[in-house]
Amino acid sequence: KSQDYIAAIAQFEQAARDPAYHLRAFGQIGLCYRALGLVPQAVAAFRKACMDYDAPRTQSLSVRYLLGRTLEQLGEKPEALEQYRLIFRTDRTFKDTAVRLSSLEGDQTREAGQPGTHSWRFGQAWKHVRQLLKGNS
């Protein structure tokens, strides 16, 4: 199975040479590295993908989200938080970014020795907004 991922990485690296496939190819390379347990290499691939500023917004947000999740996996919470903030500025409803953002901000607040009431209020407000959007008020 790992041989399949390694072969796929080589194919995606070739595809990444074409600017039209840069973001998607490096996104897939990152996923292959994650599947192989090579998390730092996955982060590097996702970062390369995020450098494609001409990519469609949804694809760009998806890869940035994967970068954030992978950084969280490595314990790089401040960097993950930065990625989620970039996503949130563009699309406040993208996946569970708001929840992750609130959670990581709360973690940072607690690590600084301050109560996390601001993050808790944000989380509660966001929960209420989601309920309103779903029509479950």
Q: Residue ranges of each PLM-predicted region?
A:
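Intrinsically disordered, low-complexity, charge-biased linker/tail regions
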Residues: K1-Y21, Q28-L31, A35-Y65, E72-S137
